[in-house]
From Swiss-Prot:
Ca(2+) 2 binds at residues 59, 61, 63, 70. InterPro entries: CALM/Myosin/TropC-like, EF-hand-dom_pair, EF_Hand_1_Ca_BS, EF_hand_dom. This is Calcium-binding protein SPEC 2C. Keywords: Calcium, Metal-binding, Repeat. Ca(2+) 4 binds at residues 131, 135, 137, 142. Calcium-binding protein involved in larval development and metamorphosis. Likely to function as calcium buffers mediating the transport of calcium from the sea water to the blastocoel where calcium is required for skeleton formation. Pfam families: EF-hand_7. The keyword Metal-binding applies.
Amino acid sequence: MAVQLFFTEEQRKVFKSSFKSIDADGDGKITPEELKAAFKSIEIELTQEKIDEMMSMVDKDGSRPVDFSEILMKKAEQMRGKGAQYFKAFDALDTDKSGSLSPEELRTALSACTDPPMTKEEIDAIIKKADGNNDGEIRRAEFVRMIQSSY
């Protein structure tokens, strides 16, 4: 399925685990009753109207109940919306418009929003963690993955 390529293997595992925890009868589909029970198990009481509204947001084909692919598609839709915001943030930080964030660009940005300013070692650790191709800079895709993995 193409939408699965949008997510990392780790993300898919988390989504699948969450899905299975709601799918009480294990049939691969989530019914309104299962969704309501899942919320009730964490002491959140929702009206049937709210449950129906939530189901409709995910159930694009109106088939009720919803399956895992519909959940993935909704999550991808949400992440694509956030992706545009991440791209704007990246572009604002990429002051030399090189298509990557240098340690200096990251240091400037982080020192403006942290007090006390982050140390060189702390910034180097961030770059090392985010730098998938080990070129010492953070490319746009690496930046988006870094932001997404922190949530």
